[in-house]
From Swiss-Prot:
It is a multi-pass membrane protein. Gene3D superfamilies: 1.20.5.2700. It comes from Paracoccus denitrificans. The lineage of its organism: Bacteria, Pseudomonadati, Pseudomonadota, Alphaproteobacteria, Rhodobacterales. This is NADH-quinone oxidoreductase chain 12. NDH-1 shuttles electrons from NADH, via FMN and iron-sulfur (Fe-S) centers, to quinones in the respiratory chain. The immediate electron acceptor for the enzyme in this species is believed to be ubiquinone. Couples the redox reaction to proton translocation (for every two electrons transferred, four hydrogen ions are translocated across the cytoplasmic membrane), and thus conserves the redox energy in a proton gradient. It catalyses: a quinone + NADH + 5 H(+)(in) = a quinol + NAD(+) + 4 H(+)(out). PANTHER family: NADH-UBIQUINONE OXIDOREDUCTASE CHAIN 5. It is found in: Cell inner membrane. One of its GO terms (molecular function) is NADH dehydrogenase (ubiquinone) activity. Pfam families: Proton_antipo_M, Proton_antipo_N. GO terms for cellular component: plasma membrane.
């Protein structure tokens, strides 16, 4: 079954992409959609029936050369099971939604066949992500990692007639190459130090890596910290963290279903998954974890500030994704990997619903995306309105404080903020502020879109209509997850340390528990006279057990938490004001948004006029694009022109053209003049040749 889940989307993609002329475009759409729903059902069966014990499922010997051996295998553990349901559920619903959304696309003419290609790309995207999350070694993961990058390039640039779409696709691809270079260096370093790319073998050697110093860039580094940092650079690119985030908003150039798939289930979650998968390494790399916390918290704050002033409905949600990913990285950085995965799971439901809801709004408004041209749509598209409301309740964290009752984001985001309080004061305060901003821009979206009087094109508003059932049914399914996912899975993900340990089969935990029980049992039954053991024997056994525990501890579970990692327990005992602070931030953001856009709609304009520098700073996304244009893009273009004109044009082409059009014609003209046709000229040349040969022979004889 696991192999079917992995390879079925690939087969469907190939049939739809290469064989749609034979089976028909409509059949290609239904084939890919049906296969994804079947994979989704199997994934849920695997998730619900999984006992937590990791399994290794071989597929084939992939790379065998010299001493290097890498097989293609499926690693099925709790992390994999979670990602399987996230990827296949969202992808199946996006496929279904796309049947309606892509039915009539104004970017294509009636005689252009684009639907089969689109669905083939979607299915290939899904396969690449499944390849990534089921990987049993870093090479296999990198294959899926790059496959996701290629698929995102194809889908972001799907409207290839638009220059902006082509530019966005190139930007996403190039920025991710920067992160991928760091990921590759990390893989090379791990293989160089451990001799393997297989996860269990790497994890087995992590304690030794933590005690190893290596020379890199003219200074000594702790191996575990350096490798953790390099791997996280790859995660920064894929998950659009600060400094490598600039591609994510531009990715909105692709069709809206693509945005839902990228932001909720596939590409951007890959970085979070990578850090959680490599938790045994990060538990021995404290400096790398601190770096993750700083980047994650700063990204959450940065993206939330930019989202305050965005007017494109899709870009608002895009920046919310960037911000929420920062939350996940903070959780992973402080060592509560289960909380990071918890938020990844709940976020998939409400973020996919928000994007698909935005697509429904855009569909109703004839592809208008500027929220300033919306208004009063809640009566026109009531199903979409309620779906977006539920998504907003979830992302802003609506729930009952100090209880486990609330929408999905209420429980998962609060778990991260409480963990941040226990692990990093810097991250805690930035996340609370970001929660307030998240509430503000989320309710701003709701108020501008669904409340007030119609603005902009009144013809579009008058003819606005609800989306067909094929588009609203996925919204309803996702709404169920956005409401109940947090309450259902709070316990095994964060609620109790013992439950989390059992659920994720945390490496070393069961071994230690078993040893403790055996020791207690032996102590209770052993006679007093046998309680005193031979000192040397006891010390030898203790040393052997310590050595065994040190080697085995990071291996055998979905995640690993060091015995000294007590952040989750400390988070559970955080003060009440810490647990209530996200709710207060949410209410403050809601009240501010209501004041700005319902009670006093002229206030935002006046405030922007009063603080123009701050407004432009946020509207221009902290000027990251302009800074990168000045520091990287222009110098790169200048260097490219120099190498093109001076290197390729002047040196390479100049040399070849100079020889071909200058030297060779002159030599041929000289040769023509030598061929005079007179016999005595040829005889004289022969005599000169013979004389020359004789002189050469005599000179060699003299030596």
């Amino acid at each position: 079954m696991e192999k079917f889940v992995l390879f079925a989307p690939l087969i469907a993609s190939l049939i739809a992409g290469l064989g749609w002329r034979a089976i028909g475009e409509k059949a290609a759409q239904y084939l890919t959609t049906g296969v994804l729903f079947l994979s989704c059902l199997i994934s849920w069966y695997l998730f619900l029936s999984f006992d937590g014990v990791p399994r290794h499922i071989p597929v084939l010997d992939w790379v065998v050369t010299g001493d290097f051996h890498a097989e293609w295998a499926i690693r099925l553990d709790r992390l994999t099971a979670i990602m399987l349901i996230v990827v296949t559920t969202v992808s199946a619903l996006v496929h279904m939604y796309s049947l309606g959304y892509m039915a009539h696309d104004d970017n294509w003419t009636h005689d252009e066949h684009y639907k089969a290609r689109f669905f083939a790309y979607l299915s290939f995207f899904t396969f690449a992500m499944l390849m990534l999350v089921t990987a049993d070694n870093l090479l296999q993961m990198f294959f899926g990692w790059e496959g996701v990058g290629v698929a995102s390039y194809l889908l972001i640039g799907f409207y290839y007639k638009k220059a902006s779409a082509n530019a966005a696709a190139m930007k996403a691809f190039i920025v991710n190459r920067v992160g991928d270079f760091g990921f590759l260096l990390g893989i090379f370093g791990i293989y160089w130090l451990t001799g393997s790319v297989q996860f269990d073998e790497i994890f087995r050697q992590v304690p030794q890596l933590a005690q190893t110093e290596i020379d890199f860039l003219w200074r000594d580094w702790n191996a575990a910290n350096l490798l953790g940092f390099l791997l996280f650079v790859g995660a920064m690119g894929k998950s659009a963290q600060l400094l490598l985030h600039t591609w994510l908003p531009d990715a909105m150039e692709g069709p809206t279903p693509v945005s839902a798939l990228i932001h909720a289930a596939t590409m951007v979650t890959a970085g979070v998954f990578l850090v959680c998968r490599m938790s045994p390494l990060y538990e021995f790399a404290p400096d790398a974890k601190n770096f993750i916390v700083i980047i994650g918290a700063t990204t959450a704050f940065f993206a939330a500030t930019v989202g305050l002033v965005q007017n494109d409905i899709k870009r608002v949600i895009a920046y919310s994704t960037c911000s929420q990913l920062g939350y996940m990285f903070v959780a992973a950085g402080v060592g509560v990997y289960s909380a990071a995965m918890f938020h990844l799971l709940t976020h998939a439901f409400f973020k996919a619903m928000l994007f698909l809801g935005a697509g429904s709004v855009i569909h109703a408004m004839h592809h208008e995306q500027d929220m300033r041209n919306y208004g009063g749509l809640r009566k026109k598209i009531p199903l979409t309105f309620w779906a977006m409301m539920i998504g907003t309740f979830a992302i802003t964290g609506v729930g009952i404080p100090l209880t486990h009752l609330g929408f999905a984001g209420f429980l998962s985001k609060d778990a991260i903020i409480e963990s941040a309080y226990a692990g990093s004061g810097y991250a805690f305060w930035l996340l609370v502020i970001a929660a307030c901003f998240t509430s503000f821009y989320s309710w701003r979206l709701i108020f501008l879109t669904f409340y007030g009087k119609p603005r902009g094109d009144h013809h579009a508003h008058d003819h606005a209509h609800e989306s067909p059932p094929v588009m609203t049914i996925p919204l309803g399914v996702l709404a169920i997850g956005a409401v109940f996912a947090g309450m259902v899975w709070y316990g095994p993900f964060f609620g109790d340390h013992h439950k989390v340990t059992e659920y994720f089969h945390i490496a070393g935990a069961h071994h230690e528990a078993a040893e403790g029980e055996e020791a207690e049992h032996a102590t209770a039954e052993a006679p007093v006279e046998h309680a005193v053991a031979d000192t040397a024997t006891a010390e030898g056994e203790a040393a052997a057990e310590a050595e065994h525990a040190e080697i085995a501890a990071p291996v055998g579970g979905a995640i690993y938490m060091h015995p000294d990692n007590h952040i989750m327990d400390e988070a559970h005992h955080a003060p009440a004001w810490v647990k209530v602070s996200p709710f207060v931030a949410m209410v403050l953001g809601l009240i501010t948004a209501w004041t700005f856009y319902i009670a006093n709609p002229s206030l935002p304009r006046r405030l922007a006029a009063h603080e123009p520098a701050l407004y432009r700073f946020l509207l221009n996304k902290w000027y990251f694009d302009e800074i990168y244009e000045f520091i990287f893009v222009r110098p790169a273009k200048w260097l490219g022109r120099v190498l093109w004109k001076g290197g390729d044009g002047a040196v390479i082409d100049g040399t070849i053209n100079g020889v071909a059009m200058g030297l060779i014609p002159r030599l041929t003209r000289a040769a023509v003049r030598v061929q005079s046709g007179y016999l005595f000229h040829y005889a004289f040349a022969m005599v000169l040749g013979i004389v020359g040969l004789l002189i050469w022979v005599m000179m060699r004889g003299a030596h």
